[in-house]
Amino acid sequence: MFKIQNKMNINPIGLLYSIILFIIGIKLRIWWINNVPTTQIYDFQTYQELATNIFLRVGFVLDGQPVAFQGMAYPTVLGYVYRFMGNAKEMTAKNFNVILSALTMIIIYLTLIKLTTRQLVIYTAFTMVALLPNYIAYNNVIGTEVFITFILSVIVLLQVYEFDNRIRLPLLGLFIGGAALTKPFFMAYPAVVAVIFWLKEKDLKRTLISFAAIFLIMSLIIAPWTYRNYQKFGRLIPVSYNSGYVFYLNNNAYNTNGAWMPIKDAYASPELQKQIDQILENGKRSEKVAHELEVVFKPEANKWIRENPREFIKLGFIRLKGTFFSGSWDIDTWTMNDKRPLEANLKIWTKEQRIEHERQTNFTKGLRDMVVHLLSSFGFLFVLINAKDILLGLFSKTRSLPYERTIPVINSAFFILIYFIFEGQARYNFPVLMFFAISTALCLDLLRKSNNKI
């Protein structure tokens, strides 16, 4: 089905290296989920509860109430995986993550050998994806990180492999629909595909037709869930009702760190506070089932941004810092937070053993932090380097750009914009890191060529 061209650079040594690296990557992921204890908390606990309810055939509910607080795709798919396996154990979810992670590595490799013929870029980027601490550790949590990255890798693969559009475009619409049902901001992703197509092909008619076809299929994929939400909540909710909730908590007069904050700590006028108290029944009702909050929160967030554009921009940059330049604290917090085995060891260790453990822990965390900062730095740098050419290409009928540049840049810019506006925290960098890995490899290749000319 794929039109494999001679440009695709598959050499025996490189293929052997990739297979060995793939096996090492899988073994590291399996080792992590079997040896590093963690507790599923907050969103991860909610996903497990939703998936368990699907497994038990009680529906997409929390505490017996219908809910659409988060995207439905991941917990629903996981619930059916539980049914297939006959249990709803956490280890089943973790093994599912490893399978998805393995498939993602294969897909990224296939994408890289189509994206570029440069060996250094292919194998540097693939090495980073296979061995990246984040991509190993997050197999340990019941969350959307591994799932959405798998879907996104398929979407990118379908963009770079050009075959019959009668098959290709519906497949893109299908997977983008799945991504939107996981993360609702992917409803805007058909525009990303259209921009990438336009910059490559410079055929406006084909670009518009492609956009329309992808958007239509995506909408058809989302439509049944939208209809379900209308039946349950009496209003149009395409995927979830937490966008206004997140938007307001991240953009209000009392927010100083650009991140989520408890409702009780967010600014609220007396009138708004009265509405909140009524909706939440003075704290007796969970925010996760209070779909009415979106209706009152979203206008308040928009109003605050209009009245405080400078403060909004400040929060946006703080969000980007928190997402891409705050190191890897999220790995400790989400993927290895069960400290009971360590606490038991600390009671019997000597002082020297405790010091050695603490030193090793800080050393490992320092290395992880440097990797994230390095990838993020090169990722942002590559966006900036290519920004001028891409902007000129958007308004030119003849200036085309290859996927090698547009795929990492446009996708990175898409996530950067989303996080700038809505919400940022370290674990949100997860799906972007594969684009940053490609950008890093491309930047290193540029540096190598520059040094050769000196």
Model-assigned labels for residue ranges:
Residues 17, 92, 105-131, 149-150, ...:
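Transmembrane-helix signature of polytopic, membrane-embedded enzymes
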Residues 95-116, 154, 158, 381-385:
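Transmembrane-helix motifs of polytopic, lipid-linked glycan transferases
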Residues 20-22, 72-76, 84-106, 123, ...:
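Loop-to-helix entry region of an early transmembrane alpha helix in multi-pass inner-membrane enzymes
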Residues 36-50, 59-61, 65-80, 87-91, ...:
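Extracytoplasmic catalytic/substrate-binding loops of multi-pass membrane glycan-assembly enzymes
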Residues 42, 69, 93-100, 124-154, ...:
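Multi-pass, polyprenyl lipid-linked donor-dependent membrane glycosyltransferases
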Residues 114-116, 155-171, 198-201, 444, ...:
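Membrane-interface transmembrane helices that cradle and orient dolichyl/undecaprenyl
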